[in-house]
């Protein structure tokens, strides 16, 4: 890591183990230890600024958010290893902020667009197999972030050197599944290829949802 950041003025730390599947140890190694290694290398090599890619999951507490901002505290009721380890990693990064190393954290949510190998491929695979499910009535509101928006935000954060400040990042307003890009894409593919309509399922209470995840 030292060799990778040597002679660099700025570093964008965007690597992480995302998703909700995998052993706890792997999330710790990549998200927490990996961030610690990046911070240590930046300090050792005299890097001037570090932009850390975080996630809104670090403040999720099981409730819906509307108009949330960076004043929300970290969650303490984690639903997955990803959220918990990313919260710890964000703290590691922000605590390193100093006059020597300017640090900020951004929290883009559900990044999509060219190069996506995480969100849309899985949604399309489930739809193709006729196994896509919609939890609730399909009107759930979720902020998403196009990859171009995320990239612009990282560059803007670097320019502003927002030391120790995490900005919620997402669409200009929440979108609903039925009117989102994913909904339009799925409708077009269903009509063209004859895929099954996604099956709505009742929204389970939170404890039942956790049990299902396990």
Language model segments and positions:
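Terminal hydrophobic/aromatic helix or amphipathic segment near a protein terminus
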Residues: 190-214
């Amino acid at each position: 890591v030292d060799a990778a950041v040597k002679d660099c003025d700025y570093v964008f730390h965007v690597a992480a183990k995302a998703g909700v599947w995998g052993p706890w140890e792997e999330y710790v190694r990549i998200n927490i230890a990996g961030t610690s290694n990046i911070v240590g290398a930046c300090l050792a090599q005299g890097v001037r600024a570090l932009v850390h890619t975080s996630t809104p999951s670090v403040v999720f507490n099981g409730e819906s958010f509307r108009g949330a901002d960076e004043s929300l505290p970290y969650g303490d009721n984690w639903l997955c290893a990803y959220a918990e380890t990313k919260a710890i990693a964000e703290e590691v990064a922000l605590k390193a902020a100093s006059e020597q190393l300017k640090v900020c954290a951004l929290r883009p949510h559900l990044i999509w667009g060219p190069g996506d190998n995480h969100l849309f491929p899985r949604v399309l695979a489930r739809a193709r197999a006729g196994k896509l499910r919609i939890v609730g009535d399909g009107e759930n509101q979720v902020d998403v972030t196009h990859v171009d928006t995320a990239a612009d935000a990282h560059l803007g954060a670097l320019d502003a050197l927002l030391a120790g400040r995490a900005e919620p990042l997402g669409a200009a307003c929440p979108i609903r599944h039925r009117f989102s890009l994913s909904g339009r894409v799925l409708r077009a593919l269903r009509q063209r290829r004859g895929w099954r309509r996604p099956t709505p399922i009742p929204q389970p209470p939170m404890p039942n949802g956790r049990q299902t995840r396990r």
